[in-house]
Amino acid sequence: MNTPLTDLLGCRYPIIQTAMGWVADANLVAATSNAGGFGFLAGAVMTLEEIEQGIAAIKAKTDAPFGVNFHMYVPFAEDIVDLCVAQRVKAVS
């Protein structure tokens, strides 16, 4: 299915799995992305190290694109952005 959203995010279906705190972990994100949706890791409830581990776990389970959600007001927000860029995460919110 081609829509502006699927073209932008590189997913098969225009379905976004939101970054629900304490629920949207690497397993859910990878499963969503593998099913053709676009999964978001709930980084807003994680430390930088947990986000890094989550990204690695997602990449071990899927080659499909995914995103990371986080709060811009955390002291390490710039580090999260740098991590997402370095890991080629498709989207952040």
Describe the function of each predicted region.
Residues M1-S93:
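Active-site entrance/lid segments in N-terminal catalytic domains of soluble metabolic enzymes
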